[in-house]
């Protein structure tokens, strides 16, 4: 761990507010801002294809003028991706001087729970709500209710087709799939393979990022200079035990023919033990659609070969800063969508990768709430 990351780890543990404001000030983040008009009821990738796209850097917002209260509705806290998002939210809440309450549901099969959290946030009269929707469309009515109550609603990471959102902060979810799959294709070419068989563990069906992963993989496969056969796609919640079962079923059907498995942040690590147990450790290579601290360690140890990186910490930083800027009335023209630029990690660049833009510091203990009045 380098000195900066060690300092951030110690800072998170002690929670000193004055020091936190210094340490948490992030470097400007490469983004694409997408301005209206955009395709109605579309995804972030639809906005990218239809809106006015302005590349740039997202700089840290100035300290808030008042103690704004912002609720963050996460789908769960069961994998390290959301721990990284929580770190980005809480560290920036300290720096900005605002209240942040993270209200997680119990998982991607807990839409009812997330809708209830939205009702609670509306009833509690938060100044803004930032939601990571479980569904592309099933959260739309609750988002509209919040807006009707006069509460701005922003989106973080998970995509939605709601036109009632004030702002989306995410990445090109389709690019998650294309970039991870293109890495697989380059690796296969370097190995001299003329065709490859792959299987996908993309996560829960119905989540916007899962569709993006699969669509992106299909696009990259169609454009590939070699034959790419997608033998199997197994959907399910990103809970580790379930994903290990799904990986086992893939191996039972296709293990002898399979070259690669591409999986989500909770899915890719879960495939490793079944692969080893089935005796395919030297045959099947695992690549991840996104990056967590766990996956970074597995890449360093050469158990996972590569990961696309949606930079969850950076997304969370931009989301809370954008919420504060919106509440403060800063800025002349509000974009429809802000896309954070993707990264790509493998064993070649792991020694120089800027992990502080993507994952929580080593040893970070998740905190779900911050109130500057209690510092």
Residue ranges and their predicted role:
Residues 21-66, 202-205, 317-375:
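Hinge/cleft segment of the Venus flytrap/periplasmic-binding protein
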Residues 16-20:
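Sec/Tat signal peptide C-region and signal peptidase I cleavage site
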Residues 280-348:
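Flexible loop/turn connectors
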Residues 70, 89, 180-227, 231-233, ...:
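An alpha-beta-alpha
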Residues 136-175, 189, 197, 292-305:
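Flexible loop/hinge segments that line or gate small-molecule binding clefts
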Residues 124, 128-148, 217, 235-298:
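Hydrophobic alpha-helical
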Residues 114, 169-195, 212, 242-244, ...:
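Hydrophobic alpha-helical segments within soluble ligand-binding/sensing domains
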């Amino acid at each position: 761990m380098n000195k900066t990351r060690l300092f951030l780890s110690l800072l998170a543990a002690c929670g000193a507010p004055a020091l936190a404001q210094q340490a948490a000030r992030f470097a400007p983040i490469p983004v694409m801002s997408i301005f209206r008009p955009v395709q109605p009821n579309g995804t972030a990738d639809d906005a990218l294809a239809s809106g006015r796209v302005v590349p740039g850097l997202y700089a840290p917002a100035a300290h808030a003028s008042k103690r704004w209260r912002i609720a963050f509705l996460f789908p769960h806290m069961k994998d390290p991706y959301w721990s990284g998002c929580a770190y980005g939210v809480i560290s920036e809440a300290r720096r900005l001087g605002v209240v942040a309450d993270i209200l997680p549901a119990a998982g991607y099969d807990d839409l009812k729970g997330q809708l209830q959290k939205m009702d609670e946030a509306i009833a509690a009269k938060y100044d803004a709500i930032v939601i990571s929707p479980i569904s592309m469309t099933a959260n739309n009515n609750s988002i509209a209710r919040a807006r009707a109550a006069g509460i701005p609603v922003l989106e973080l990471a998970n995509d939605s087709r709601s036109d009632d959102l004030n702002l989306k902060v995410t990445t090109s979810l389709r690019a998650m799939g294309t970039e991870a799959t293109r890495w697989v294709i380059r690796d296969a070419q370097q190995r001299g393979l003329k065709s490859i068989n792959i299987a996908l563990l993309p996560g829960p069906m119905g989540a916007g990022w899962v569709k993006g992963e699969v669509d992106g993989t299909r696009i990259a496969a169609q454009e590939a200079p070699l034959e790419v056969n997608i033998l199997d796609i197994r959907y399910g919640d990103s809970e580790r035990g379930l994903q290990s079962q799904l990986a086992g079923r893939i191996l039972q059907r296709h293990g002898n023919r399979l070259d690669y498995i591409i999986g989500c942040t909770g899915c890719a690590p879960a495939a490793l033990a079944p692969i080893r147990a089935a005796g395919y450790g030297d045959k099947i290579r695992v690549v991840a659609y996104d990056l967590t601290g766990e996956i970074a360690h597995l890449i360093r140890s050469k158990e996972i070969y590569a990961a696309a990186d949606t930079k969850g910490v950076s997304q969370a930083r931009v989301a809370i800063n954008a919420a504060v800027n919106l509440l403060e009335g800063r800025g002349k023209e509000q974009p429809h969508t802000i896309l954070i630029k993707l990264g790509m990690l493998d064993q070649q660049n792991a020694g120089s990768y800027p992990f502080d833009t993507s994952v929580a510091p080593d040893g970070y203990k998740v905190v779900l709430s911050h109130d500057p009045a209690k510092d």
